[in-house]
Amino acid sequence: MDLARQKFSRLLEEQENLKKHGVCIRVLGDLPLLPLDIQELIAQAVLATRNYNKCFLNVCFAYTSRHEISNAVREMAWGVEQGLLEPSDVSESLLDKCLYTSNSPDPDLLIRTSGEVRLSDFLLWQTTHSCLVFQSVLWPEYSFWNLCEAILRFQMNHSALQKARDSYMEERRRQQMERDQAYVTQKLQQEGFASHGDSRRRRTLLQKCTTMREERIQGFLQALEHKRVDFFERLCPVSA
């Protein structure tokens, strides 16, 4: 933990450079597991840079992918419990938005060094359609040419990965449309229409359903962001 204290203290000393280059620091993980003084250093770094948006430094600390996913599920359950979401709003797409990495795109390329051929519970959800490159070189010895090899492998597989990603997103959209259509059919039946209903009424209900869902989700995500910021502000009220 001494190394973490040194590094986060150094980041706080570099606030002018962070501001100059617009670096936003994000620390991803189960932070309450850490010693309180390190939590406070992290909170200061995160709050001091949260409005910068030129580049982003994501630091996974006290992090496992299984915890990240289970935490995202708990956050969605909290949203339903608080009345911010309907149970029907819960989806893979919403889970994406509840992950620690929600403000960053999924990685195109993940490099694992040291000859280990496993992800070690790291970004399991986010790397579904990423290029995974396993190399035997140790990290301290990683060179420009090792990076070139990894990038070349990514380029060779990019087309297939992009096709798989596009197909997956299209399937997500189709499933969401099916859920919306089922909701509209139920509403029409409650109003006494046949299952196919009036086409104009169906379109109106479908648009209303989509709009209301998006509004609920945006309200929930704002509440979730406020909840996370509040966690950091409680750790360093002076900086808040």
Model-predicted regions and their roles:
Residues 1-240:
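Flexible, compositionally biased loop and terminal segments
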